[in-house]
């Protein structure tokens, strides 16, 4: 194609995530997020808004709000993860689609999908 894509896939989606149509939802989410006392994570978090690693709570919160209506920077995220030479990488959220995609790119990294309560409480995932 003109944009250089090799192939395009239709992904089933229940909401118009990561686009401007979700801006009103992000405002409501901001209200909820502001009522939560977030603690600084013990590891760095890479979010889809800017593809950079941080453990600053304020930045993580701002990015969580923005990622509802802003595009995912998948290639940038994969490049950032590759540069970190990680032994383990976690996908947080429902489903395992992204974990599958990550395994193709991060071949030397163990990819763990944290998509339910059991996966979050299984200590073996974090050793």
Predicted regions, residues:
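Acyl-group transfer acyltransferase/transacylase scaffold of fatty acid/polyketide systems
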Residues: 1-127
């Amino acid at each position: 194609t003109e944009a250089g894509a090799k192939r395009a896939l239709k992904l089933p989606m229940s909401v118009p995530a990561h686009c401007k149509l979700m801006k009103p939802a992000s405002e409501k989410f901001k209200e909820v997020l502001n009522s939560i006392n977030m603690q600084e994570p013990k590891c760095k978090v890479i979010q889809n808004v800017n593809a950079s690693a941080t453990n600053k709570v304020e930045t993580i919160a701002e990015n969580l709000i923005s990622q509802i209506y802003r595009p995912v920077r998948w290639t940038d995220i994969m490049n950032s993860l590759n540069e970190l030479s990680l032994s383990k990488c976690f996908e947080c959220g429902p489903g395992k689609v992204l974990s599958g995609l990550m395994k193709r790119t991060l071949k030397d990294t163990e990819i763990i999908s944290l998509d339910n309560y059991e996966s979050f409480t299984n200590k073996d995932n974090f050793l």
